[in-house]
């Protein structure tokens, strides 16, 4: 059994796109896809899918989010107001938290 990689972002993180057609846009992470090294971000990388008519449903053009490679997003720090790198620190109780490298703000509460 092959497990996916550990990624620097988690579900519900606020991220900013650093490259591509949606550069400088921010959004909330909806889903993590470790096997594809990708993330789904709310309102980012919108694509159109043409669906066939099925039974009583008519065909339509549906807009939805597509996967973005995890290297194209960075965590957005609300305190700094910028995209930042993170560091993992261990608290006294043994819990690991992600910390902003620039200001020291903890992302995992």
From Swiss-Prot:
UniProt-listed GO biological process terms: translation
**Any keyword Ribonucleoprotein?**
yes
Alphabetically ordered keywords of this record: Ribonucleoprotein, Ribosomal protein, RNA-binding, rRNA-binding
* One term under GO cellular component: ribosome
Q: Which Gene Ontology molecular-function terms are recorded?
A: rRNA binding; structural constituent of ribosome
Assembly and partners are described as:
Part of the 50S ribosomal subunit.
Family stated for the protein in its record: Belongs to the universal ribosomal protein uL24 family.
Q: What does this protein do?
A: One of two assembly initiator proteins, it binds directly to the 5'-end of the 23S rRNA, where it nucleates assembly of the 50S subunit. One of the proteins that surrounds the polypeptide exit tunnel on the outside of the subunit.
Q: What is this protein called?
A: Large ribosomal subunit protein uL24
Organism equals Geotalea uraniireducens (strain Rf4)
């Amino acid at each position: 059994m092959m497990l996916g990689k550990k990624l620097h972002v988690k579900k519900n993180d606020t991220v900013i796109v650093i490259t591509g057609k949606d550069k400088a846009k921010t959004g909330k992470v909806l889903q993590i896809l470790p096997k594809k090294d990708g993330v789904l971000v709310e309102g980012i990388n919108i694509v159109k899918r043409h669906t066939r008519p099925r039974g009583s449903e008519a065909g339509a053009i549906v807009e939805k989010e597509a996967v973005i490679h995890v290297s194209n997003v960075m965590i957005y720090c609300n305190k700094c107001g910028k995209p930042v790198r993170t560091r993992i620190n261990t608290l006294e109780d043994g819990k690991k938290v992600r910390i902003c490298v620039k200001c020291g703000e903890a992302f995992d509460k």
